[in-house]
From Swiss-Prot:
Name of the protein in its database record: Cell division protein ZapD
Principal location class: cytoplasm
Keyword Cytoplasm annotated: yes
NCBIfam families on file: PRK05287.1-4 (NF003656)
Length: 252
């Protein structure tokens, strides 16, 4: 099964981008190759750009507090495990405290590192990080994998509270909905939303379906058009057959 997630507001789009970039950074950091560590650093620079929104940290703190209050209402509910509830509340409280402990603008310590910013600037230019452009970076890439990894982890560590908070919010968002099975007739599907917009929808398609969903929506209608996987065509071609899929509406 392949799941496609479609966020309907900029805040959720930002959290999904951060999740993707933190995962890439972690993956490439754990590898030993110089090229992988370069990819990790470039992903870290992208985190810096995406997280640059002035209100992102406060948005996350407020959302975590809202979820904490929601969970508190389940105290003494016989249908809810007190142990699981206490664990979830503790995780949220720890994450909020870590966010509050992030002083100043997110990633400001990286912006104040002239050497890293010179690499970031050159990395935005196609082929801009050749050894003749950045000899000091070329030297760094020839240090031991352990030395490079320690440096990457040290640069990333102050931003990890952001990763952890985003992970909590996205986990709660994804678990808020229940999938329902639908069929797109001739590759087309429309659903009347009745004026209630979701924050995100998840479309799950069996890998054997060979169909890719394209989603558009407003608070009244959800439209899904399934296209065929690309095979060298200039323009995507629509599926002209019925496609079975699961649809999940997610809201916090």
């Amino acid at each position: 099964m392949i799941t496609y997630e479609y966020p309907f507001n900029e805040r959720i789009r930002t959290l999904l981008r951060l999740e993707d970039l933190f995962e890439k950074t972690a993956y490439f950091t754990q590898e030993d190759g110089a090229l992988e560590h370069h990819a990790a650093l470039v992903s870290m620079f992208e985190i810096l750009e995406v997280a640059g929104r002035a209100d992102l940290k406060m948005d996350l703190i407020q959302e975590l507090e809202r979820q904490r209050q929601t969970l508190l209402a389940f105290r003494n509910n016989p249908d809810i495990s007190e142990e699981a509830l206490s664990g979830a509340l503790y995780e949220i409280e720890q994450s909020s405290a870590a966010l509050l402990g992030m002083a100043g603008k997110i990633g400001q310590y990286l912006r104040e590192n002239d050497w890293l910013m010179s690499i970031k600037s050159r990395a935005a230019i196609p082929g801009g990080v050749c050894e003749f452009d950045l000899p000091s970076y070329h030297w760094w890439l020839h240090r031991s994998p352990e030395t490079r990894r320690d440096a990457l982890e040290g640069w990333l560590k102050p931003m990890l509270p952001l990763r952890d908070a985003a992970a909590i919010v996205l986990r709660l968002l994804r678990s808020s909905g229940r999938p329902k099975n639908y069929t797109a007739t001739n590759g087309q599907f429309q659903l009347n939303l009745g004026g209630s917009a979701a924050q995100m929808v998840r479309v799950t398609v069996h890998v054997d379906e060979q169909a890719i969903p394209e989603v558009s929506a407003n608070k009244y209608f959800l439209n899904i058009r399934f296209t065929k996987p690309p095979a060298g065509e200039i323009k995507a071609r629509g599926c002209e057959r019925d496609v079975a899929f699961d649809l999940t509406f997610c809201n916090l």
